[in-house]
C-alpha cells in the first residue's frame, strides 16, 4: 500500500482549504493539500466577488496575518468599490468583482509557490484513527497519507444534493461529485450533523443582454484594495450594471412556486437569511414591486454574466420565463441554470476555539462544514484551523472577539451554533469602532509575527508604516495651539483659553490633515500616513472609552473553567442552562455569557463558583 507522510493534511482546495494549507505551510510544517482536481483549487463556486460589509473586514484580517485571499483578490479584481463610503471608516467595507479564471490561476500559483506544500489529487474516502486521535486519511485509490493533524474543508460537498425544480441529483457543486463516504465517517464519530442549503442564479450570455437599457455601475475612481501589500489594481477595470424585477416577474414566480424545489418540499435544509432566493424574496417581501439585480461580469475574456439577486431552484423553463420578463434581459440566453444545493454541516458547538473537534486530537473543521456561508468566512476559518493544525501540541492561535472579526465569528459559532448559514456583519461586533479595515494590520500583524506566519516583505512594510505613524501621532500630540491661533487658521474652536493639540484639531469633522499641514508645514506627512492619522484622531476619544470597557470586561471574561467542570451539579441554575452549558462546554466565562438564554444572575453564580474553586485549589 502506497503511503506518504506529512505534518498537516488539508482536505479540500476551496477558500477555506487554500487558506488553511497556506497558513500551515507558512509556519514551516510539511503540508498536503488534497483535492479532487488541481484545476478546482480556488474556484469561485458562486458569485465572482470578494468582500463587502463585514466580509471585507475578514479579508483584511486574513491579509494582516499574511494570508492569501486579499492578494489574490487584488490581482484578479476587475472592479473595486468601497461600500458604506458615506459612513464612518468602522463600517466601510471594501468589495471587488473578480475575474473568475484569474482568481483561480492566481490562487493555484500561490499554493504552488510554497516549498513545503504539496498538492495531491484524489478523493478522501476515510480518516485513519487511533482511538480518538486522527492520524491521516485513506484515499479512494487505497493509498494512505499520514499526518499529526487533519483539516477538513469540504464546503458544500458533504452528501451534497443539487435541486433544479423537481429534479434532484448528487453533487458538491455543478459538475462535481459529492463527498459521501467522509460524511458517513462523521456519522460514525457521533458528530452532530444538520442540513443547510444555498443557491446560485442562472448564468447569462452577455452578448444576449440589451446593455443600453441598463443602469451602469462603475467602480471607484480611487480603488480601495484588500492587501496592505498591494499598490494598485492589476487588471483593466470594468462596469457592472443594475436592473430590477417587476410585477410580471413576480407573477411568473408566484404561479410556479409549487414547482420550486424549496417550496415544493424537496429541500429540508435552511437557506441563508441574507442571501435569499428570488422565490423567497417574492414570498417574504410580497409588498415590494421590484428587487434589484446586479449584472456582474465573470471575467475580462468571459462572455458569462452573474445576475446577483435571482438565485433559484425553479425549473429551467420558469427560470427562462422570469429572466426574460426583466428589463434588458428580454432576449437573454441562459448558459447554466440556477440551482439550490443542500449539504451536511457539523454543529459548530462541537468545536473548540481553535476549530478542533472536541473529543478528538488532530481533527479540525473550517468553512461551510461549520455552518457558515461566504468565501470570506470560509477563508478566515481556514486561516485559524491551518495555524492551529500546524501548532498541534505546541500552542494555539485563538483570535479574540475584542480584537478581530475573525474572533467574533468563531466565538459566535462555537457558543451559539447556527440555525441558518452564518454571515458576517459589522453589527455582530461589540467593539467595531476599533475593529476597522484600516487598522487590521495594527491589530493582527504583531500577533502573526510572534507566531511566525508573517513573511519578511510584510514585516518590513509594517514596521516602516508603524514607525512613520507613531512619529506622526507623537508630533500631533506634542504640537499645540491657542484658541486664537486655531481660529486665525480658520479652525473654529471655543475661546476658552484651553490649548489644543494637533490631534485635537484633527479630530474635528471639518478639519483635514492636508489643511493642518498647509497651515503648519512641520506637520507634513505622506498621503497614507495622513489618512491613517485622521482616522486615529477621529476615533481616539471613543476608543479610549471603549478600551476601558474592554479591560473591565476582559478581567472576568478570560476566567477559565476547569476541563471537567460539572455544570449539571450547580444548584441555582435552570435545567435549560445546565443542559446548554453541558452541551457547549464553554472554556471561559466570556464564552458562557454568550450562550443563548444566559442571564446575569446565572453568570454571577458561575463566577462565584469559579472563584470558590480557585480558592480551594490555592488553599
Curated annotation (Swiss-Prot):
Binding site for FAD: 12-17, 124, 179, 368
Keywords: Cytoplasm, FAD, Flavoprotein, NAD, tRNA processing
Cofactor: FAD
Domain of life, per lineage: Bacteria
GO terms, molecular function: flavin adenine dinucleotide binding
Keyword hit for Magnesium: no
GO BP annotations, alphabetical order: tRNA methylation; tRNA wobble uridine modification
Location of the protein in the cell: Cytoplasm
Family membership noted in the UniProt record: Belongs to the MnmG family.
Function statement: NAD-binding protein involved in the addition of a carboxymethylaminomethyl (cmnm) group at the wobble position (U34) of certain tRNAs, forming tRNA-cmnm(5)s(2)U34.
Subunit record text: Homodimer. Heterotetramer of two MnmE and two MnmG subunits.
Name of the protein: tRNA uridine 5-carboxymethylaminomethyl modification enzyme MnmG
Organism of this sequence: Dinoroseobacter shibae (strain DSM 16493 / NCIMB 14021 / DFL 12)
Source organism phylogeny: Bacteria, Pseudomonadati, Pseudomonadota, Alphaproteobacteria, Rhodobacterales
Gene: mnmG
Amino acid at each position: 500500500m502506497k503511503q506518504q507522510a506529512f505534518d498537516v493534511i488539508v482536505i479540500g482546495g476551496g477558500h477555506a482549504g487554500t487558506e488553511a494549507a497556506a497558513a500551515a505551510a507558512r509556519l514551516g510544517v510539511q503540508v498536503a493539500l488534497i483535492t479532487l482536481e488541481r484545476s478546482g483549487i480556488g474556484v469561485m463556486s458562486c458569485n465572482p466577488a470578494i468582500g463587502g460589509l463585514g466580509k471585507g473586514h475578514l479579508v483584511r484580517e486574513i491579509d494582516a496575518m499574511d494570508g492569501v485571499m486579499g492578494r489574490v483578490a487584488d490581482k484578479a479584481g476587475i472592479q473595486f468599490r468601497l461600500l458604506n463610503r458615506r459612513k464612518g471608516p468602522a463600517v466601510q467595507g471594501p468589495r471587488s468583482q473578480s475575474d473568475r479564471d484569474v482568481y483561480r490561476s492566481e490562487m493555484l500559483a500561490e499554493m504552488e509557490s510554497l516549498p513545503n506544500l504539496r498538492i495531491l489529487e484524489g478523493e478522501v474516502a476515510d480518516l485513519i484513527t487511533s482511538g480518538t486521535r486522527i492520524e491521516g486519511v485513506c484515499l479512494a485509490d487505497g493509498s494512505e497519507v499520514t499526518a499529526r493533524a487533519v483539516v477538513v474543508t469540504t464546503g458544500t460537498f458533504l452528501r451534497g444534493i443539487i435541486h433544479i425544480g423537481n429534479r434532484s441529483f448528487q453533487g458538491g457543486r455543478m459538475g462535481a461529485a459529492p463527498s459521501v463516504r467522509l460524511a458517513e465517517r462523521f456519522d460514525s464519530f457521533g458528530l452532530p450533523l444538520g442540513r443547510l442549503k444555498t443557491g446560485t442564479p442562472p448564468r447569462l450570455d452577455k452578448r444576449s443582454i440589451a446593455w443600453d437599457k441598463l443602469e451602469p455601475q462603475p467602480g471607484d475612481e480611487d480603488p480601495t484594495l484588500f492587501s496592505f501589500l498591494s499598490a494598485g489594481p492589476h487588471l483593466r477595470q470594468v462596469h457592472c450594471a443594475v436592473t430590477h424585477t417587476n410585477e410580471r416577474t413576480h407573477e411568473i414566480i408566484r404561479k410556479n412556486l409549487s414547482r420550486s424545489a424549496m417550496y415544493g418540499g424537496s429541500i429540508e435544509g435552511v437557506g441563508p437569511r441574507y442571501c435569499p432566493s428570488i422565490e423567497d424574496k417574492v414570498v417574504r417581501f410580497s409588498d415590494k414591486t421590484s428587487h434589484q439585480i446586479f449584472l456582474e461580469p465573470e471575467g475580462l475574456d468571459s462572455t458569462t454574466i452573474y445576475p446577483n439577486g435571482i438565485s433559484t431552484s425553479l425549473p429551467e423553463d420558469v427560470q427562462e420565463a422570469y429572466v426574460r420578463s426583466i428589463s434588458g434581459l428580454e432576449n437573454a440566453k441562459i448558459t447554466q441554470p440556477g440551482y439550490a444545493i443542500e449539504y451536511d454541516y457539523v454543529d459548530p458547538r462541537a468545536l473548540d476555539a481553535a476549530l478542533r473537534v472536541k473529543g478528538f486530537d488532530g481533527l479540525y473543521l473550517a468553512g461551510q462544514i461549520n455552518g457558515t456561508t461566504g468565501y470570506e468566512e470560509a477563508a478566515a476559518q481556514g486561516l485559524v484551523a491551518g495555524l492551529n493544525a500546524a501548532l498541534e501540541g505546541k500552542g494555539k492561535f485563538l483570535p479574540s472577539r475584542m480584537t478581530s472579526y475573525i474572533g467574533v465569528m468563531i466565538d459566535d459559532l462555537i457558543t451559539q451554533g447556527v440555525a441558518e448559514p452564518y454571515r458576517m456583519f459589522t453589527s455582530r461586533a461589540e467593539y467595531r469602532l476599533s475593529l476597522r479595515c484600516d487598522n487590521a494590520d495594527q491589530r493582527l500583524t504583531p500577533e502573526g509575527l510572534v507566531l511566525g506566519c508573517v513573511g519578511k516583505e510584510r514585516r518590513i512594510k509594517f514596521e516602516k508604516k508603524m514607525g512613520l505613524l507613531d512619529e506622526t501621532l507623537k508630533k500631533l500630540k506634542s504640537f499645540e495651539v491657542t484658541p486664537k491661533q486655531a481660529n486665525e487658521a480658520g479652525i473654529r474652536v471655543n475661546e476658552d483659553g484651553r490649548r489644543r493639540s494637533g490631534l485635537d484639531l484633527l479630530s474635528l469633522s471639518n478639519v483635514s490633515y492636508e489643511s493642518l499641514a498647509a497651515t503648519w508645514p512641520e506637520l507634513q506627512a505622506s498621503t497614507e500616513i495622513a489618512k491613517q492619522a485622521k482616522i486615529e484622531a477621529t476615533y481616539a476619544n471613543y476608543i479610549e472609552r471603549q478600551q476601558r470597557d474592554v479591560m473591565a470586561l476582559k478581567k472576568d471574561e478570560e476566567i477559565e473553567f476547569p476541563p471537567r467542570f460539572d455544570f449539571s451539579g450547580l444548584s441555582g441554575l435552570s435545567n435549560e442552562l445546565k443542559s446548554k452549558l453541558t452541551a457547549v462546554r464553554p472554556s471561559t466565562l466570556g464564552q458562557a455569557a454568550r450562550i443563548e438564554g444566559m442571564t446575569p444572575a446565572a453568570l454571577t453564580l458561575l463566577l462565584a463558583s469559579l472563584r470558590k474553586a480557585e480558592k480551594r485549589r490555592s488553599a
